Amino acid sequence: EECEREKPPEGLAMDFIKRQFEIGEPEKDLCLIAQGLVCMGPATTSICGAQCPKVGIPCQGCYGPTKAVEDQGAKMISAIASDFGVEKDKTVDPEKVAEQLDDIVGTFYTYTLPASLIPMRVHKGGK
């Protein structure tokens, strides 16, 4: 764990997902996930020193998944669902959580879609 941002003592919990422009500049020391931003840091190889979160930008996962993670996007989707309490609180609608994300594949698979577990079709002629 390279990120120096503080996680709340009660653990991460989200009530909403926001985009960076919606919150402006995030709180300086508080975990970006705790502020409602999707940050790929927890599922990303930590060799960069968490440079993006240091300056208030959520990690996009550009160094790929950790060795312990087979599918980076699936891991983050699971983490976000956990942060919303989908597993414990049966009143949380997983579809409502997903609706808050404009582009699930683009958000969680920006750098790793070809290696993901998402089944893809290859059409003749490359289309």
UniProtKB/Swiss-Prot annotation:
InterPro entries, A to Z: Hydrogenase_assoc-protein
GO MF: oxidoreductase activity
SUPFAM superfamilies linked to this entry: HydA/Nqo6-like
Annotated EC: 1.12.99.-
The keyword Oxidoreductase belongs to this UniProt entry's keyword annotation: yes
Chain's role: Part of a complex that provides reducing equivalents for heterodisulfide reductase.
Protein name: F420-non-reducing hydrogenase subunit G
